[in-house]
Amino acid sequence: MLGTFQHSSLRIEVNAKEADIRDSLLRPSQLQKWLWPQQFNQGLPEQLQPGLTFTSSLGPVTIQHYVDVSQPNCLRLLLSQGIDGFHEWYWGEGWVQSRLEGISILPLNLGQTISLIQLREFLVKKNIPQT
């Protein structure tokens, strides 16, 4: 694998319920709405389950994801191809934590930061009452 070893752990506060955070991370239909510009392959199940393998692309870079752990407050993805490593998510009422480690030519810390900001914005918009 070409690239450098990178690792990053970030935790943010979000004005959202644990259930909304969980749905945003474990349901591919929700994940695709906020994790732009990353594109996921078609035909994903309603919810990420252990043992599932899927791919995403970020421009010309393809990333393979293997769902190692999928629990009510934790998601662990083993990554290969464009990133050789793992991505862990933990969450609770009002907070999300992301830990990313891997070898890649991509700037993982920057991507992780942008993803968390996008998730927070998505959750804020989702929780605005419709009039």
Language-model-detected regions and their locations in the chain:
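Beta-strand/loop substructures that line and gate deep hydrophobic ligand-binding cavities in soluble
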Residues: 74-131
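Glycine-rich portal/gate segments that line the openings of hydrophobic small-molecule binding cavities
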Residues: 13, 32-36, 40-83, 99, ...
